Amino acid sequence: MSQESLVLRGTMRAHTDWVTAIATAVDNSDMIVTSSRDKSIIVWSITKDGPQYGVPRRRLTGHGHFVQDVVLSSDGMFALSGSWDGELRLWDLQAGTTARRFVGHTKDVLSVAFSVDNRQIVSASRDKSIRLWNTLGECKYTIQDGDSHSDWVSCVRFSPNNLQPTIVSGSWDRTVKIWNLTNCKLRLTLAGHTGYVNTPAVSPDGSLCASGGKDGVILLWDLAEGKKLYSLESGSIIHSLCFSPNRYWLCAATESSIKIWDLESKSIVDDLKVDLKQESEMSSEGTASGKNKVIYCTSLSWSADGSTLFSGYTDGLIRVWGIDRY
């Protein structure tokens, strides 16, 4: 059986600060959208043209602070962003303009998501609340106090499982919570982390949830029953997690590297580290930032066909990895 590993295919350079989120198109088209602490969102065309893997097609501006998250509608027509300015924005990508502003959170918005049918939007904030909106920018429900998180809500996701419509949230209170989307009531609290949770990820079939954060441990949960299945040690703070769309793999962006696990064997498929020397040889302009700065990955997204892993870093670069068989 052939082994698989990932190789650096190229980089994408336009952001001037941390790349906080990457959204890839559901139809595997040549567009990706990224958000950054430079307060902008960039729409890219993937060209696969030598070391410069893609070119910035449009820069979307309007947020007054770091843009922390961005997602795409399934038809690729709209992007949705959340910012430390406390707002969400819905962007018309054809026009390059803000179609809607969502105002209601009282502190930084840390995470946004679209439901599978794109008709509902969920957001998470440092104000410790989760808000459910329609696409007109009207807040339909606020989850706060009571069963809600007792600290910043760092990440929120819809489960792709339509039979049991669910919102999954992760928080600095060290828990992951599962909410019933139909009535916004708490279904389960998943406790086990010893530090804040940065990111829950839901598997493509909606059966599994992976969570990670400060303690460097990834916990795998059965989403239906809320049972902890097993844990994976990453060794350093986890900033982002994502499941491969077509392999039984989980990727973790940690402070030391990007680690990819095969969940069947629970073994590491690859451990991706940045090689600045190799990159300056690949690119004509050399590396933009200081040679000795600690650079780590803050955002991850697979292409829809699972062949390409896009990773965003603290130096503003997007590094693009492709699967090699050997």
From Swiss-Prot:
<feature type="repeat" description="WD 5">
    <location>
        <begin position="192"/>
        <end position="222"/>
    </location>
</feature>
<dbReference type="GO" id="GO:0005829">
    <property type="term" value="C:cytosol"/>
</dbReference>
<feature type="repeat" description="WD 7">
    <location>
        <begin position="292"/>
        <end position="322"/>
    </location>
</feature>
<dbReference type="InterPro" id="IPR045223">
    <property type="entry name" value="RACK1-like"/>
</dbReference>
<dbReference type="GO" id="GO:1990904">
    <property type="term" value="C:ribonucleoprotein complex"/>
</dbReference>
<dbReference type="GO" id="GO:0005840">
    <property type="term" value="C:ribosome"/>
</dbReference>
<protein>
    <recommendedName>
        <fullName>Small ribosomal subunit protein RACK1</fullName>
    </recommendedName>
</protein>
<keyword id="KW-0687">Ribonucleoprotein</keyword>
<dbReference type="Pfam" id="PF00400">
    <property type="entry name" value="WD40"/>
</dbReference>
<feature type="repeat" description="WD 1">
    <location>
        <begin position="14"/>
        <end position="45"/>
    </location>
</feature>
<dbReference type="InterPro" id="IPR019775">
    <property type="entry name" value="WD40_repeat_CS"/>
</dbReference>
<keyword id="KW-0677">Repeat</keyword>
<dbReference type="GO" id="GO:2001125">
    <property type="term" value="P:negative regulation of translational frameshifting"/>
</dbReference>
<keyword id="KW-0853">WD repeat</keyword>
<comment type="similarity">
    <text>Belongs to the WD repeat G protein beta family. Ribosomal protein RACK1 subfamily.</text>
</comment>
<dbReference type="GO" id="GO:0005634">
    <property type="term" value="C:nucleus"/>
</dbReference>
<comment type="function">
    <text>May have a role in cell division.</text>
</comment>
<feature type="repeat" description="WD 3">
    <location>
        <begin position="104"/>
        <end position="134"/>
    </location>
</feature>
<dbReference type="GO" id="GO:0072344">
    <property type="term" value="P:rescue of stalled ribosome"/>
</dbReference>
<dbReference type="GO" id="GO:0043022">
    <property type="term" value="F:ribosome binding"/>
</dbReference>
<dbReference type="GO" id="GO:0005080">
    <property type="term" value="F:protein kinase C binding"/>
</dbReference>
<dbReference type="InterPro" id="IPR001680">
    <property type="entry name" value="WD40_rpt"/>
</dbReference>
<dbReference type="InterPro" id="IPR036322">
    <property type="entry name" value="WD40_repeat_dom_sf"/>
</dbReference>
<dbReference type="GO" id="GO:0045182">
    <property type="term" value="F:translation regulator activity"/>
</dbReference>
<dbReference type="InterPro" id="IPR015943">
    <property type="entry name" value="WD40/YVTN_repeat-like_dom_sf"/>
</dbReference>
<feature type="repeat" description="WD 4">
    <location>
        <begin position="148"/>
        <end position="180"/>
    </location>
</feature>
<feature type="repeat" description="WD 6">
    <location>
        <begin position="233"/>
        <end position="262"/>
    </location>
</feature>
<dbReference type="InterPro" id="IPR020472">
    <property type="entry name" value="G-protein_beta_WD-40_rep"/>
</dbReference>
<keyword id="KW-0689">Ribosomal protein</keyword>
<feature type="repeat" description="WD 2">
    <location>
        <begin position="62"/>
        <end position="92"/>
    </location>
</feature>
